[in-house]
Amino acid sequence: MRFPSLILAPILAAATTIAVTAEEVTLPQDEVASLAAFDRLVAVIEHPRCMNCHTSTDFPRQGNARLRHNMGVARGPENHGTPALQCATCHQDNNAPSGVPGNANWHLAPLSMAWEGLDRRGICRQLTDPARSTMTPEQLVEHMNNDPLVLWAWNPGNDLNGLPREKPPMSAGEFGELVRVWVANGAQCPD
Amino acid sequence: MPVLKVNGSPHEIDLPDDTPLLWALRDTLGLLGTRYGCGAALCGCCTVHADGKALRSCVATLADVAGAEILTIEGLGTAATPHPVQAAWLEIDVAQCGYCQSGQMMQAAALLREIPKPSDADIDAAMSGNLCRCGTYSRVRAAIHRAAEFI
């Protein structure tokens, strides 16, 4: 079934009827709420502050232009860099005044959580497919609400030119609540 | 007063927690072998070890290294008993101007601690963040292979 995302935004009272190309399909309220929440929260997932370390490659990216990380930095066997050039060689516990971003657990997301190259439907499928995701929906709620590295996206500091890094397009609290709503209503994915 | 453990010795350091480690090493302890290059972890010149791992001391603060054992080039080896990396560096005659070489050697020593017999790919992966304006990269690679033979 297909339907445009624009019509998911309104809060619906009970069962909802959505016009589609060939027929009318009635969606339960919880499914509509879940899809509407995902339609909004995915803008954060697609933001460079998140996507640069949720890559599908052997290396992270950096900046809003999402260029390959400087100095040939690689993913390494544990997603923390190569054995002698770890993320922590340069990335410390906090953002550095020089512009090097920091967090106590700076690392790449594992390939099982790679979102790069996926469309929104694909990202949702990756997040919710038990065969691919390393997190249950409940763990995703925890990760996206409380993981300090996720929350770094809203405290990204300045770049090497001294300019503030762009933050995701909504607050951390709003994002976290949307993730809760998405999961509480079944972690639905768009078709 | 915070205590900084450097090259096996404790030092009382009366500096703010957000002071870069490099400042404490050079300006307070007088350990001038660790060099300032870019100040933003972009060149590797200031590399030291913290608990055996390579660390860019220009961006690591004293708070970041609290409790860690810091090793600088002065503590890596001595003239009488050089670290295998230092012995290989001398044998291959790696240095040209030499400014970046303490960082190169500390990074190489960290690599050999993790991978005693590194491949060219291992060396490239470990050393790609250490820049050298003189372009000594091929000698750096050769010296790391030679140091591996000494270990």
Give the positions of each predicted feature:
Chain A
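N-terminal export/targeting leaders of redox proteins
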Residues: 1-42, 62, 73-78, 95-191
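Short, well-structured alpha-helical interface segments that form or flank functional binding sites
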Residues: 36, 48, 82-85, 174
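N-terminal, post-signal-peptide region of Sec/Tat-exported proteins
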Residues: 46-80
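The canonical Cys-X-X-Cys-His
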Residues: 48-57, 84-94, 179
